[in-house]
């Protein structure tokens, strides 16, 4: 049943080509825009408060990534969330580096409190810190294992009514009703900057067509990362191959490679 849901979501993204509004960081804008295009969605990077109400009126979802956060960005992000709420759109929050600084932690929590329909996508240390527990991180990199964040994820589900995607060697999708485990991916993936941010952007595309759990995006990127690594000499070629494999991914390959339970 889970596999069929994932396939249906992939089909819907490619048929509907949803517009995804991204307020994201300077490091990954190109990566995430290309990934959205490759999977079949339509990205737009919208950072001006003057256009956000209009953008959210006709977009499919809002992605907020705090990777290069500053005091100018926070009010825009909060305003965008309010507009997403007004239009009954899902907000996907990537709390990059949450726990590394007070600013990142407090801003992540403020955005999470504001959003009516929320998916949180982060690594284990970010999820643990967002839940108010003691996390182990080095900047934006996680030192905690993904399974160590399961309790924190369940706290976030309860506190914010969110669905939570924990990225790591094993990915977990946590909702109020279930915990789904994904065992795809490749050890080379963390050596490409913005891989988690790419997953967050893809989560926005799938949320726009009805997958408000985050499952389909995590499944697709895990399988694609695994396939891409097989023909990659290192992180540089992996990044390039990833876009090609997102574009080329067919349903039969996804069914054959997917490790979900």
UniProtKB/Swiss-Prot annotation:
Substrate binds at residues 45, 194. Keywords: ATP-binding, Kinase, Magnesium, Metal-binding, Nucleotide-binding, Thiamine biosynthesis, Transferase. InterPro entries: Hyethyz_kinase, Ribokinase-like. SUPFAM superfamilies: Ribokinase-like. It catalyses: 5-(2-hydroxyethyl)-4-methylthiazole + ATP = 4-methyl-5-(2-phosphooxyethyl)-thiazole + ADP + H(+). Gene3D superfamilies: 3.40.1190.20. ATP binds at residues 121, 167. This is Hydroxyethylthiazole kinase. It comes from Vibrio atlanticus (strain LGP32) (Vibrio splendidus (strain Mel32)). The gene is thiM.
